[in-house]
Amino acid sequence: MSFTVAIVGRPNVGKSTLFNRLVGKKLALVDDTPGVTRDRRPGDARLMGLTFTIIDTAGLEEADAESLQGRMRAQTEAAIDEADLSLFVVDAKSGLTPVDTDLAEMLRRRGKPVVLVANKSEARGSDSGFYDAYTLGLGEPTPISAEHGQGMLDLRDAIVAAIGEDRAYPEKEDVAVTDVDIPQSSDEGDEDEEPIYDDTKPLRVAIVGRPNAGKSTLINRFLGEDRLLTGPEAGITRDSISVEWDWRGRTIKMFDTAGMRRKARVIEKLEKLSVADALRAIRFAETVVIVFDATIPFEKQDLQIVDLVLREGRAAVLAFNKWDMIEDRQAVLADLREKTDRLLPQARGIRAVPISGQTGWGLDKLMQAIIDTDKVWNKRISTARLNRWLETQQVQHPPPAVSGRRIKLKYMTQVKARPPAFMISCTRSDALPESYTRYLINGLRADFDMPSVPIRIHFRSPDNPFEGKKRRT
């Protein structure tokens, strides 16, 4: 992207609505409640031939530096310093407030280009607020309606005028396309070849867990900066925020998510939106780290989150956070491992790593567990090896007999990876008990070293060409 733009303004003037309009997706949560956005969120904006990086920010308010609102303000000011240009959004419908005046003064002191945007200009009675915006001393306001998409051409022209045509439209260079991602090995390929794991591709990782488990603190420690809001208050994170960083030469894209509580406790509409956003992050990720509070682990909600991640087909890693607060670490670790095996039988062999997001202890081991788990999630096994294995499994533990006739497993192949899924051709597939399926899944985990990822097996009976036809008498 050629330049970076920060959207700033007081709460509830329509910043996130404008952000979603510019990126062409509903990435940021939008609600009538003031202060929905808390962290700064970057995105790729496209505006009538103009491309740039856009940053959505929290509403600016006067607040004590140590308060939640004060920490939100610090995040927004960091976005302003990072950006080349600020879109200062005011509400033309409700008019100016003293906060708008203070923000205008703060932006002037920064000395960077500012485009004054009068949002909600389609509303009846907005003319007064539009003309009042001139008094801020930031030039002519650009009237728009972020909700309805009106005034976007004028907004583009104002951005180009503020940033300069050379920055807005840099000369395009002929660049060979080398980063097109066409994943073939995950769903198709030579059945007799087992593809080599590609450790150069960016890895998408979602960080999930109960409120106040330390998810944002963990990501900040990875990044080495206070990129995300943290604090003692539960439920600080609302949007799923993505950040990128490099680990041993590999790009990692991490998604911080809102804390997930039990459904019965989720009453507010805004929290429901936040949880839905977290679910989307899980589905978009490749590997999901479920963060447990090691001081109070294995709450019912922890187990439900793990089950949800596995049902979505994601690779899963457990992180027992706040390890710096544990005294008898050896005894606690042994207890946690015993409970993991007992309470999460569907995740047999799942990698569990004790960490401290506060001090950074154990984070290298956690990252290695994430990479190792992703390798398993992408694993493919040749058809020849699978059928030799299937024959051995049936010798050791034959399938049960149904109505006096034993079920025969004839052929096995892997139909996809991410997560690994297999198809077995057999007789009477509808009569095969669940216990035998579990036996095969556990065998695959043990014999092909496939812990911590969901494994799917589909059984199929060959079509009977004579089914439905009358027998001759």
UniProtKB/Swiss-Prot annotation:
Domain EngA-type G: 3-167, 203-378
CDD domains with a match to the protein in the record: EngA1 (cd01894), EngA2 (cd01895)
Domain KH-like: 379-463
UniProt keyword Signal present: no
One BP term from GO: ribosome biogenesis
Top-level taxon in the UniProt lineage: Bacteria
GO MF term list: GTP binding
Cell division found in the keyword field: no
Keywords: GTP-binding, Nucleotide-binding, Repeat, Ribosome biogenesis
Residues that bind GTP 1: 9-16, 56-60, 119-122
UniProt binding sites for GTP 2: 209-216, 256-260, 321-324
Any one Pfam family match given in the protein's UniProt record, by short name: MMR_HSR1
Described purpose of this protein according to its UniProt entry: GTPase that plays an essential role in the late steps of ribosome biogenesis.
Subunit structure, as described in the record: Associates with the 50S ribosomal subunit.
Family as reported in the entry's similarity comment: Belongs to the TRAFAC class TrmE-Era-EngA-EngB-Septin-like GTPase superfamily. EngA (Der) GTPase family.
Protein name as it appears in the record: GTPase Der
Organism expressing this protein natively: Rhizobium johnstonii (strain DSM 114642 / LMG 32736 / 3841)
Lineage: Bacteria, Pseudomonadati, Pseudomonadota, Alphaproteobacteria, Hyphomicrobiales
